[in-house]
Amino acid sequence: MKMKLGTNLGFAINKYIEPEVWAKIVREDLDLKSVQFVADLLNPFLPDDYINSQLMRIKEAVKKYDISVDSIFTSAFTRVNHLMNPDAEARKIWLNWFKKLFWIGSELGCKTGGSHFGILTFDSFEKNYDFLVEEGVKGWQELSFHAKELGYESLIFEPMSVPREMGNRVSESIDLMNRVNANCGIPMKICLDIGHAPHPDERDPYPWLEKLGSVSPIVHIQQTVLNKSNHAPFTPEHNETGIIKADKVIAALEKGGCEETIFMFEIGHREHWDTEFKIIADLAESTRYWREWVKE
């Protein structure tokens, strides 16, 4: 199996937002060359002039540090209802938002991108589930043709942890993917997160890797414990109690027929005195742990 190691840039939100800063950290402190850019660092709602100036900065920074921007994704502050918003006008706004997001990604060289599938409110989950899921499917289908024009090879969505947020079972994730792919410009695939704690009957991450790894060009990696998504680093302290073992992850993917994937760290540090000053050290330790298996 062909493997690469990189990081989702969620760790940089509010902390290392300057392109020159996060690019230097990724390349020199973490010894990584691949990133997943996130919308929270350059929101498509921002004015065009500002977006264009920031794109120039980002391009210069990644060129200087020889970094590849392989994909673009939503993140903490863009984890919203979007294509399954109960309001039709809001759904249209978010559809156009995604089109602009994928354009931003294309400017940075991305070949895939995506988000969670969509989120229902408690009220819409009870009253309009089928209609809004179909709206989500149609939205992603339209985006797949748009992304094809931008040079993308696929779109990806991330299975989430509760029914309202879609994909909390393997079968549901496959069904959503297949429904989009019934009429698509480029295929919809999966961005697995090995730390998500979905349906109570399916909380072991390794069967997910076996069953969906072959359609997961990107896998979010984090250390965690059973029944909780910790987004913890792969440090000795967390590895001692955590359920994620790099060799087991790779073995499960290979068993499921995965031929190629990019492991992207999605590690979070809350704003707390005990974690604020060891973010980079924890990320670097996580890279050292995974480098035993992912050599590139």
Give the residues covered by each predicted segment.
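Active-site-proximal loop/turn and secondary-structure-junction residues that shape catalytic pockets
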Residues: 11-13, 39-41, 75-78, 117-121, ...
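Aromatic-lined substrate-binding rim segments of carbohydrate-active enzymes
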Residues: 48-66
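Surface-exposed, active-site-proximal loop segments in enzymatic domains
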Residues: 43-52, 76-96, 118-132, 230-238, ...
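A short beta-strand-loop structural module common to alpha/beta enzyme folds
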Residues: 33-43
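Short coil-to-beta-strand
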Residues: 30-33, 62-74, 106-117, 217-219
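Short beta-strand segments at enzyme active-site cores
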Residues: 36-37, 70-74, 110-117, 152-158, ...
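Active-site acidic/histidine proton-transfer and metal-coordination neighborhood
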Residues: 64, 81-189
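Histidine-acidic metal/acid-base catalytic patches
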Residues: 1-6, 13-31, 63, 109, ...
